[in-house]
């Protein structure tokens, strides 16, 4: 199904939400550290990402999917939570759906690695 050299095409919706996240961060001055900003830049400017970035995105959503969306001001564009800005920077809801698809592919690759 793939290996660590594979590239994963970034969907248009992910790019759009990543741009919204960048704009929110610029407007409010908070949300997202160095890693989030680096991934956001890749999501906005590259047509695809590599294995390491795919793993980082999947890890982010696994860690944040249960805590960020129910938090206060999540989804509020005028006074957004830090979690909302980071969520958008990582591709938003489109990125979350995409990460679920990527997760299946990554799980297969990681399983193959363990069997070697």
Q: Can you say where each PLM-predicted feature lies in the sequence?
A:
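Extended terminal accessory/targeting regions
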Residues: 1-116
């Amino acid at each position: 199904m793939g290996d660590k050299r594979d590239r994963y095409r970034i969907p248009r919706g992910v790019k759009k939400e990543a741009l919204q996240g960048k704009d929110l961060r610029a407007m409010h001055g908070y949300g997202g550290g160095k890693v989030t900003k680096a991934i956001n830049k890749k999501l906005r400017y590259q047509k695809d990402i590599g294995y390491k970035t795919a793993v980082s995105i999947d890890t982010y959503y696994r860690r944040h999917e249960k805590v960020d969306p129910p938090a206060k001001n999540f989804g509020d564009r005028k006074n957004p939570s830090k979690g909302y800005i980071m969520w958008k920077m990582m591709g938003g809801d489109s990125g979350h759906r995409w990460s679920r698809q990527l997760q299946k592919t990554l799980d297969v690759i990681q399983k193959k690695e363990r069997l070697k």
